[in-house]
């Protein structure tokens, strides 16, 4: 009986490793429900406004995000909407990361070539890998979801890796 439970657990762990996103079918199979995302619990990383202020003096800033409807309002409520020149939200576009189409659309709409853009993200699978595939430079922030991931192959290796958002300033402003 103990051995059967161990095998079942190992099987579940293998399934979830293969299916990193924990899709609805897997959740249903195991009798689980996907928790609703709570936008009221969202917070900014420390010094976000100051960092955006500094970067905005040197760069055009944009967002490519898998977000629920209302992203612009949430950015406005945080007091950071005006720092961004372009916002590409999956809820508005019907495209989502890691689909390279959302990255290509953002580059096209901003008249930016891939080698001129830098993707800063906390997810290897949704941010770093697809941006690298289309030729963008990448910075992986090991903060938030990023703190849980580990680089497993060259495709997942960002051009720069930092521990927190403030660490991007020496890279981008030097």
Where are these regions (language model features)?
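N-terminal helical cap/lid subdomain that shapes the substrate entry/recognition surface
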Residues: 1-57, 68, 72-73, 160
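Asp-based, Mg2+/Mn2+-dependent phosphohydrolase catalytic module
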Residues: 27-32, 49-53, 59-174
């Amino acid at each position: 009986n103990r051995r059967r439970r161990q095998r079942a657990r190992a099987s579940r762990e293998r399934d979830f490793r293969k299916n990193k996103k924990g899709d609805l079918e897997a959740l249903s199979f195991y009798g689980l429900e996907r928790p609703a995302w709570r936008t009221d619990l969202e917070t900014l990383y420390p010094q976000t406004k100051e960092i955006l202020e500094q970067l905005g003096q040197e760069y055009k800033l944009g967002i490519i995000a898998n977000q629920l409807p209302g992203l612009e309002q949430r950015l406005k409520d945080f007091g950071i909407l005006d720092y961004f020149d372009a916002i590409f939200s999956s809820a508005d576009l019907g495209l989502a990361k890691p689909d390279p189409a959302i990255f290509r659309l953002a580059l096209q709409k901003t008249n930016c070539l891939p080698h001129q853009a830098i993707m800063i993200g906390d997810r290897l699978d949704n941010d770093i890998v697809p941006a690298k595939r289309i030729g963008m430079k990448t910075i992986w922030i090991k903060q938030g979801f990023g703190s849980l991931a580990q680089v497993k192959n060259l495709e997942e290796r960002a051009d720069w890796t930092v521990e927190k958002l403030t660490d991007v300033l020496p890279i981008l402003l030097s």
